[in-house]
């Protein structure tokens, strides 16, 4: 009698059933490269150590984001949340630099690729890494306001309220707290500024993005906001001059 035995150890990072599902995909895995046409050179970006690469939407940026979940694979099984190390990848040379370890979120590149932005669940704060200074700076903190979902009722870290978007040339990032919009400086030179006054009346303001292809906000424009009073349930629209 032939017996099929599946041998698996508790020390393995992934469950055996997950390994079986991933096996075929891993056999067919491809790695992102860049072909520089003018110099006829192919530059590998993804590797077995950093297999995941994310490009800016227009795919014309000098930087790309690299990820690896392998050191934290067991967390996906136990927590249901993917942890990852974040890398900045030089599209010209393929050189990579590890920015931060053990992230639980999905970072993004700013429109002008001057910064890498992410939300830190444990700190409940926004962070940005500067390509120019090679430094990480917090954009918000809980002393100013709560930028995380205060009514989170699950046994996990709360999510961010989100962001309205970047200003032109990555000059600032506008983020949300429970009610208001805040203008933050990714260089840390200027303190965050509250742009609306929703807290006093418990009115929530959110930016209405009328053009989904807009990459940034201009400093001289007027934003259309949606307003919702959490006490009276009245809603409407407002204008905000940047």
Predicted segments with their positions:
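Beta-propeller folds
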Residues: 1-242
